[in-house]
């Protein structure tokens, strides 16, 4: 049976190739002519009631269906590469994207949804443009799929603005060359691995270490501190996680179902979707973010979870199109596909898109082509550590593994740089002393090393912070700490100004003043228990003496 299917596929492919004529060169010319027409600038926003095909658009018919690949024949008006086609006579909307030209009249397309029920001879209409999706403030608080359809059961997205998902990166003259920190209000991030406005951040973390909570806090803080919007693109991840994230955002107030104060737009193409949808959903999310940057001058936060799935889907599409695979089975256009998307994530003179990308590393192999290609584009890495999460320190960001390209005295200033490096040095010294402490105990350390350990433990606890989106779980009121307060607090701990305070005073507080207030409160509670011990406490003390 498999052999028969293989022969049918091979016959279909060879039949298509026969249409190319004696030389494949004309096909290359067609591709090169078609591409610029299909790529439309993200700054050209069409105003229309819906992205319906144009009147009098070219009509074709399906001639072959091989899984997610559909071949469509046009008698005239061959659609350019990347154009969106719509299959007629179906209850649900099925969009096909032109990927290749086979001969003079046939195009090979990738389906954006399941191809179940398709038959040869079915009519297909050319939309005359790439896939267009709704953009604008009306998308906030809503969930859409790769082709811009709402999937949150809350009716249509009422916007007149539509934009093509394929666009050129901003021109050099439009880009801003100023390096600027995006202050997140999260102490450990702002101090040790600051995010650059318009930068790309890789978020590494396993299950249960707080990736989702960190993402939600970043969305919340950017909305409150900068008035900015966020876009979350779920690329090839679990549907359950996407559903959980949506409901957690409603509970924490990031999404408001009652009015128009939502601060985030969600775009989902989960792992049950065909490869075409997973390969394009990141571009759909990016297009929504580009509107807020270019038309409203916003500093937008774009979350992509997971960028590896974008590459994985591209690999599947490439194999379906019959391209010869490159290293480790990835598509030969891996670097091009990644670069085309990543170059659109940048700062312009109007606004910025700062991207936080969760990265799955296959088999923990950082040399795998997929993560290795992503690393080339990253400006900062935020590593979430299970060992730190086990200590109860949240956010569980590893202060020694997390890095940032803008951690440079010329960008962040000498004071910030010196404090950050001082914090990392003392934490590294503490890490190297832990083996000695485990074997010989604290008493065997020199006075200088004891002081290092004491300050490092205070710094470690001061790197924790109560999150506003986690108030309902922790009972601690969330804190957003300005960068100046963060630098001042760590500077004073390093200088030894708080050597007299107990280390538990530094746990789960905002600025340093709260640690001092907490220490005073702990001292009062301690003195109160000393002066008036309870009868049970006195009895227990007597029992211990005996």
Curated annotation (Swiss-Prot):
Residues 1-45 form a transit peptide. Its EC number is 7.1.2.2. Gene3D superfamilies: 2.40.10.170, Bovine Mitochondrial F1-atpase, Atp Synthase Beta Chain, Chain D, domain 3, P-loop containing nucleotide triphosphate hydrolases. Keywords: Acetylation, ATP synthesis, ATP-binding, CF(1), Hydrogen ion transport, Ion transport, Magnesium, Membrane, Metal-binding, Mitochondrion, Mitochondrion inner membrane, Nucleotide-binding, Phosphoprotein, Transit peptide, Translocase, Transport. The modification Phosphoserine is found at residue 432. GO terms for biological process: angiogenesis; cellular response to interleukin-7; lipid metabolic process; negative regulation of cell adhesion involved in substrate-bound cell migration; positive regulation of blood vessel endothelial cell migration; proton motive force-driven ATP synthesis; proton motive force-driven mitochondrial ATP synthesis; proton transmembrane transport. The modification Phosphothreonine is found at residue 311. It is a peripheral membrane protein. The keyword Magnesium applies. It is found in: Mitochondrion inner membrane. Catalytic subunit beta, of the mitochondrial membrane ATP synthase complex (F(1)F(0) ATP synthase or Complex V) that produces ATP from ADP in the presence of a proton gradient across the membrane which is generated by electron transport complexes of the respiratory chain. ATP synthase complex consist of a soluble F(1) head domain - the catalytic core - and a membrane F(1) domain - the membrane proton channel. These two domains are linked by a central stalk rotating inside the F(1) region and a stationary peripheral stalk. It catalyses: ATP + H2O + 4 H(+)(in) = ADP + phosphate + 5 H(+)(out). SUPFAM superfamilies: C-terminal domain of alpha and beta subunits of F1 ATP synthase (SSF47917), N-terminal domain of alpha and beta subunits of F1 ATP synthase (SSF50615), P-loop containing nucleoside triphosphate hydrolases (SSF52540). One of its GO terms (molecular function) is ATP hydrolysis activity. ADP binds at residues 208-213. The modification N6-acetyllysine is found at residues 123, 132, 160, 197, 258, 263, 425, 479, 484, 521. Phosphate binds at residues 208-212. Mg(2+) 2 binds at residue 237. It comes from Canis lupus familiaris. Homotrimer. Component of the ATP synthase complex composed at least of ATP5F1A/subunit alpha, ATP5F1B/subunit beta, ATP5MC1/subunit c (homooctomer), MT-ATP6/subunit a, MT-ATP8/subunit 8, ATP5ME/subunit e, ATP5MF/subunit f, ATP5MG/subunit g, ATP5MK/subunit k, ATP5MJ/subunit j, ATP5F1C/subunit gamma, ATP5F1D/subunit delta, ATP5F1E/subunit epsilon, ATP5PF/subunit F6, ATP5PB/subunit b, ATP5PD/subunit d, ATP5PO/subunit OSCP. This is ATP synthase F(1) complex catalytic subunit beta, mitochondrial. ATP binds at residues 208, 210-213, 238. GO terms for cellular component: cell surface; mitochondrial inner membrane; mitochondrial membrane; mitochondrial nucleoid; mitochondrion; plasma membrane; proton-transporting ATP synthase complex.
């Amino acid at each position: 049976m498999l052999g028969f299917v293989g022969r049918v596929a091979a016959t279909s492919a060879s039949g298509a190739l026969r249409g190319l004529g004696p030389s494949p060169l004309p096909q290359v010319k067609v591709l090169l002519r078609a591409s610029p027409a299909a790529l439309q600038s993200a700054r050209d926003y069409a105003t229309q009631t819906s992205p319906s095909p144009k009147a009098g658009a070219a009509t074709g018919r399906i001639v072959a269906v091989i899984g997610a690949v559909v071949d469509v024949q046009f008698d005239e008006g061959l659609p350019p590469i990347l154009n969106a086609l719509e299959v007629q006579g179906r209850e649900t909307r099925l969009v096909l994207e032109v990927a290749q030209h086979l001969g003079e009249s046939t195009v090979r397309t990738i389906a954006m949804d399941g191809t179940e029920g398709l038959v040869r001879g079915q009519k297909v209409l050319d939309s005359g443009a790439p896939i267009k999706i709704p953009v604008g403030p009306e998308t906030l608080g809503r969930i859409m799929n790769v082709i811009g359809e709402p999937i949150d059961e809350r009716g249509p997205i009422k916007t007149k603005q539509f934009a093509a998902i394929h666009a050129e990166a901003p021109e050099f003259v439009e880009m801003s060359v100023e390096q600027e920190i995006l202050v997140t209000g999260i102490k450990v991030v702002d101090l040790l691995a600051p995010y650059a406005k318009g930068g790309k951040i890789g978020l590494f973390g396993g299950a249960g270490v707080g990736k989702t909570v960190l993402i939600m806090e970043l969305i919340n803080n950017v909305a409150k501190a900068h008035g900015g919007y966020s876009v979350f693109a779920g690329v090839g991840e679990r549907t359950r996680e996407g559903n959980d994230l949506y409901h957690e955002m409603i509970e924490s107030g990031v999404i408001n179902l009652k009015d128009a104060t939502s601060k985030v737009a969600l775009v989902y193409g989960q792992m049950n979707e065909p490869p075409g949808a997973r390969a394009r959903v990141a571009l759909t999310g990016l297009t929504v973010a580009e509107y807020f940057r270019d038309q409203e001058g916003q500093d937008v936060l774009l979350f992509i979870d997971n960028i590896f799935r974008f590459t994985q889907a591209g690999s599947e599409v490439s194999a379906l199109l019959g391209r010869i695979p490159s290293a480790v089975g990835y598509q030969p256009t891996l670097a091009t596909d990644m670069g085309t998307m990543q170059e659109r994530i940048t700062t312009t003179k109007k606004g910025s898109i700062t991207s936080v990308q969760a990265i799955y590393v296959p088999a923990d192999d950082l040399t795998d082509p997929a993560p290795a290609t992503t690393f080339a584009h990253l400006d900062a890495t935020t590593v979430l550590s299970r060992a730190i999460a086990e200590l109860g320190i949240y956010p569980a960001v590893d202060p020694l593994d997390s890095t940032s390209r803008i951690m440079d005295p010329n960008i962040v200033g000498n004071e910030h740089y010196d404090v950050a490096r001082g914090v990392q040095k003392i934490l590294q010294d503490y890490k190297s002393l832990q083996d000695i402490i485990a074997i010989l105990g604290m008493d065997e350390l020199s006075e200088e090393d004891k002081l290092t350990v004491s300050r490092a433990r205070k710094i470690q606890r001061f790197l924790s912070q109560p999150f506003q989106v986690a108030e309902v779980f922790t009972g601690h009121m969330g804190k957003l700490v300005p960068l100046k307060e963060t630098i001042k607090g760590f500077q004073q701990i390093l200088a030894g100004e708080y050597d007299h305070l107990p280390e538990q005073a530094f746990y789960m507080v905002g600025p340093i003043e709260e640690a001092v207030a907490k220490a005073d409160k702990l001292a009062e509670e301690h003195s109160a228990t000393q002066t008036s011990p309870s009868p049970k406490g006195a009895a227990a003390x007597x029992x211990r003496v005996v």
